Amino acid sequence: LLDKWKTEKTHRSWGWWSVIESYGKTCKIKELVVNPKSSLSWQRHEFRSEVWFVRKGTATIYYSYDKEGVKNVFKTTKVEKQTQRISRYQWHCLANETNKELSIIEIQFGDDCRESDIIRKQLPRGDYLFSD
């Protein structure tokens, strides 16, 4: 498993991600590294759920159970060795609001763990750090 950790990185404006292991189309394990003062977009998934394990750093997670993702936005903070579950269809955003790198192990599971199932939305509030 650790040999696969050295796979190719996909770079984004917020940092990078790499697939550690893939088990068909229904389960995938990735590492996400989020740069300081950066975040992923406000998004949800059609076909999968996720569990995030904080490997290094402090994660700030915004989420909403609202179908449209614009009401009742909650915020939680997770530190090393803590986890957060993101349910299928749940609006969410992973942010690194610190000055140190954030590393997350993401376990995706569901009917289809493909990147194209991401649905992004305009920000529900203007004070988030979101990027693509």
What spans do the regions from the language model cover?
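Structural motif
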Residues: S39, V51, T58-T60, W91, ...
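Glycine- and acidic-residue-biased ligand/ion/polar-headgroup-sensing regions
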Residues: F47-K67
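A short glycine-rich, His/Asp/Glu-containing loop-to-beta-strand
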Residues: D3-S49, I107
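Double-stranded beta-helix
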Residues: L1-K6, R12, C93-D132
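Short acidic-glycine-tyrosine-enriched beta hairpin
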Residues: Y65-H92
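Conserved hydrophobic/aromatic beta-strand scaffold that supports enzyme active sites
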Residues: I29-V33, V51, K75, T83-R85, ...
